[in-house]
Amino acid sequence: MKKDLQKKKKRATFLLKRRSGLKAAICLAGTFFSALFFFSGCQMEQQSFTASEQTENSSSTSEPMQEPLAVTAAGEVFLLLPDQEAACTATLPEALPHVEKDDFSVQVFEGETLAFSGTAAQLETFVPPQNGLYRYSFSNGNFSYTLMVETAFAPQIFWQESEALLGEALPLSVRYTDAQSVTAETSLSFQPVFYPVDDGWVSLLPIHWNTTPGEYPLTIYAGTSVFELTVTVADRTFEIQNLTVDETTTAQTVENDEANAEWNQIIEPLKAISDSEQYWSGCFLQPVEGEITTQYGMIRYVNGNPTSVRHSGVDLAADTGTPVQAAGKGRVLFAGYLQLTGNTVLIEHGYGLKSWYYHMDSLDVLTDQMVEQGQIIGKVGSTGFSTGPHLHFAMSVNRVFINPWTAIDKGFSWGNRR
């Protein structure tokens, strides 16, 4: 009995200890999970703050969506992506890139050289001047898109127009050719000579004032390419002038054998000179302001002589000593006194295009000197075959004198594709 009582006491003590241990374990577990919950809550709160902060920052610094740019070129539509390049080959000017985005600016590069810069609308009129590889860069301020274009155009003729009045000059150019030379044949009195330039070959075709109006064939050979063209010569009316000049003056000039021989010996050979470089740019200047007393091409009868002569330029009346400007940049072929035309300057502007200045009182330039457009080359006078102070101003393509007002009003550019 005593033993049984001791066993029950031991068991009760064991159970009590077991319950106490379990309670402690439960308390410990509760403490652990409370701590874990607290820690996790802090992490969740921290994560929630970070996500909120990221959302706020993202909304304040959001960038525009990258969208493809549709560019039409070479008969295809290219969907360009920023920082990626596409490439195509254009065999016709009509196949050059086109984009219908008014807010885009465009730059075109040949290597590192900028060939074009403008709007997408202005790009419509741009044609690369020669075959090669061009980088078209489109930008809207946020993204840039690039299209590489290899131009492989067939040889083409460019000119301002196919019709010309008597006394005009037609600028011609052949582009997109690798020909080593370009030649021409025509039934006109002048056979055009072509000169090499960076983007092809160029030439000036003058129409002599005594050409019969009508249509004239013009054949141009550029390597294996042959171009059959038609030049239409239109008529113009030339006024008639009856001029009276002191017989002493005529005897010393136009009727003087020595004066004519001097001209033929010194000046005539200079007409054939053609520098293979274009010195001028844009329109030419009227070299002096003054009243026009005689127009280009006027049919002149002197002192009742039944044989007429043609006036090669325009006469501009001005006071003696009035400065005379160079009509364009060029090289002085002659600056000196001639019995026939007095103090005279002849300037070569390139490709055979020349300007002439007669009857000056004094000269301010020398032979072989380069002059700039607008530079003073002399002063108005009345030397040589002259009836009073004026400047005789003329222009020619080699031996063919042309209307100088065309050079002043329009200039000579190498025209549009035909």
Spell out what each predicted region is.
Residues 343-348, 369-417:
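Conserved, short, structured surface segments that act as functional micro-motifs
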Residues 311-312, 326-361, 389-394:
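Zn2+-dependent peptidoglycan hydrolase active-site motif and core
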Residues 1-61:
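Gram-positive cell-envelope targeting signals
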